[in-house]
Amino acid sequence: MSSQIFASDPRIAKALQTILDRGVTGVSVTAYYRGKSVIEGTAGYANVEKSRPVDRDTIFPVFSTTKGITALAVHIQAEKGLLRLDDPIAKHWPEFAANGKEAITVEQALSHRSGIPQMPADVTPELMGDWEWMIQRIANYTPIFPPGKSNAYHVLVYGWILGEIVRRTDPEHRPFGQFVKQEIFERLGVDKSIFYGVPDSELNRVATLYGKNQETIVDKYNVNPLPVFPGPRQHNLRSMLQAVDPGAGAVTNSASLARIFSMLAEGGELDGVRILSPERVKTFSRPREGVHDIDEIFTGPVPFGAYGFWVRQEGMSDPLVGDHDNIIYSPGAGGSIVWADLRDRLSVAIVNNHMDAGVSVDPEPIWAVLGRAVREVIADLQG
């Protein structure tokens, strides 16, 4: 079965064909340069069984790529003076103080240093979609690592912690999905192609996930329990697609992700719409405290920033995103990724529906060929 490739440049088309030849099912890429969309590409199938190709309307589960957008919501509240990043979370969410969590700060949650990476022991896809159920259980957590002292990646719980902080500090107390829609998506013109909970009317646009669940990953802290594990078995379920999961549940396309991160690459403003100040955006590439220390979940150092984004650190970061320190990015399970090059005013998003794409046995990561093609096109634009 041959697959259709659409690309704005023959170099992108060639790279997409190489990616399909390596076994990826469907993929979409978009790049913005100096605030304008300059690269578009789609290839492969959104649903193999129905022979439905990936096109501009196809939306994909992007897993932890979601986290970078959720972090933006916190910074919007900080920009409005509704919170400070060094505030204890309990200042805004009093119930959170239970069981030794009273001193955990907003920044510690943003940087995965709050000590509570675990999910509720009895979580199911249906319960994960019940915001109040999740929030009540998180409020009663006891830290499993010393808050502010250990790195421990919050695989899933991250989004509810930050989302509830945003909800509590919002004068209107909007549900988190409504907040990001109104404060980010609508203002940047991407609200028709990015969802925190896919409405019934848009389910037919969602790409089917393929590949393995990688459920052999050791999870002794219940950060990623099997009933809600990021993978095809669970995340093709309607209940998962429609849950508001701000840590790993956004469903979107590369165009929307690239546009949001173009706003960051442009210093917080795009097409006359200012979301954040340039001064705040400049802080996003700052590494978290203890960035070279072992992350208890990854069991090795992880280049996470202080304010909700991965950052470039020599020898630690994904080489795909660039080679200087003024870059922020947000990767997800299966290989979806978006980054903003704050120096060169470039944003790039790659999304796909093949869960093995992020785990390559090839000496070269699957996306490297596409990254090179993108940079060749951008180099021509730079002259």
Language-model-detected regions and their locations in the chain:
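Hydrophobic (often cysteine-bearing) scaffold residues that line and stabilize catalytic clefts
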Residues: S8, I12, V62, T66, ...
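Short, conserved catalytic-motif segment at the N-terminal edge
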Residues: S3-V62, L82-R84
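Short, gly/Ser/Thr-rich active-site loops of penicillin-recognizing serine hydrolases
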Residues: E266, L270, S285-D295, G358-G383
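Active-site SXXK
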Residues: P10-Q17, G35, T58-D86, I161-V166, ...
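Short, well-ordered beta-strand elements
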Residues: V38-G41, V338-W339, R345-H354
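Short, glycine/proline-biased beta-turn/loop segments that scaffold the active-site neighborhood
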Residues: L85-N99
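Short, surface-exposed loop or secondary-structure junction motifs
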Residues: N47, N99-G322
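Glycine-rich phosphate/pyrophosphate-binding beta-alpha loops
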Residues: V244-V251, D325-W339, N352-G358
